[in-house]
Amino acid sequence: MKKNVVVIFGGDSSEHDVSCLSATTVIKNMDTEKYNVILVGITKEGKWLLVDSVKDIEDGSWREGEVKAFISPDTTTRSLVILAEGTYKLQKVDVIFPVLHGMNGEDGTVQGLFELSKIPYVGCGVLASAVSMDKVYTKIIVDHIGIDQAKFVHVRESDFEHLDEAMDRVEKEIPYPIFVKPSCAGSSKGVSKAENRKELEAALYEAVKHDRNILCEETIVGREVECAVLGDRTQVKSTCVGEILAAQEAAFYDFDAKYNNAESKTVVDPDMPEESKQKIREDAEAILKAVDGFGLSRVDFFLEESGRVVFNEINTLPGFTSISMYPMLWKACGLDIPELIDILIDQAMTRYR
């Protein structure tokens, strides 16, 4: 019997468009012999809509839809509520596959709704999602388990009342250049690189537009590498290493470099010492366990010329676009996207048994 799988995409975050791209990849690779795929898109304004087909996602016409659909928190129904023509119906749901990036998608908020509904869902739970979305608290946890990472200083929105003092504190702990990041934002939105105090001030004002908590971080010079992980209650598996080769004109691998610059490249299983690859995989698995992760995640690192592996960040709902590293790394391990989707759905179902 087919499982009713609700794929939720879009969202009112800065990564709305990337989410739509990821969703098309996921939907096109779902086995329709196994799954009855139901599409729900969330507009940038926060409207939940029933979507007819993947074609509507590709051409953007789904945003003009009129049939509203949302997950009910009523545990006795475990359903999607569909509102149309003044009436409603309940569509039974077996599993939810969220393809939501950034705020309100991978920060634990929508996962909380899924938990209330008691419907199985793909990916990390509330705790792992919330912690991993917050760069400051992720670094606190990673520091606790003894994995190398860049030096950092936490600046709060309230510190702007005495900004000179806050900048003094940052400069005391971290040498220039300094990366300034919103603590809770994805795809490098609001991230700046400051070479001096004037640029630091501007970077802080830019970051606070995106979040009230800001991470000021030491610049690490090294290769940008990533590892895909897949975990459940019993084990965590990791892939070979991937490397990001940002376009030469990009100051760092920001949103435009990731998604809009054809010069940026990804390399699967790049040339590097085997001990470095093993260290990256071990650290990636350890970090997923430390944040209580489940299902899919991608863990990013820097590899310094000295051979030191430095943690950068964890992404609990990594991109699934045609150029995304997560599915590419699993494919290199012999796991194609349809099989990967099957595993993620099976894991979600098993978690609730």
Language model features with spans:
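ATP-binding N-terminal substructure of ATP-dependent carboxylate-amine bond-forming enzymes
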Residues: 1-122, 126-127, 131-133, 137, ...
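Active-site nucleotide/adenylate-binding loops and adjacent lid/helix of ATP-dependent enzymes
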Residues: 5-9, 13-14, 20-24, 28, ...
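Residue-level detector of anion-binding/catalytic polar loops
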Residues: 36, 120, 148, 213, ...
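Peripheral (often C-terminal) accessory segments that flank ATP-dependent C-N-forming ligase machineries
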Residues: 168, 269-271, 290-291, 303-305, ...
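Conserved metal-phosphate-binding beta-hairpin within the catalytic cores
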Residues: 218, 228-229, 288-320, 330
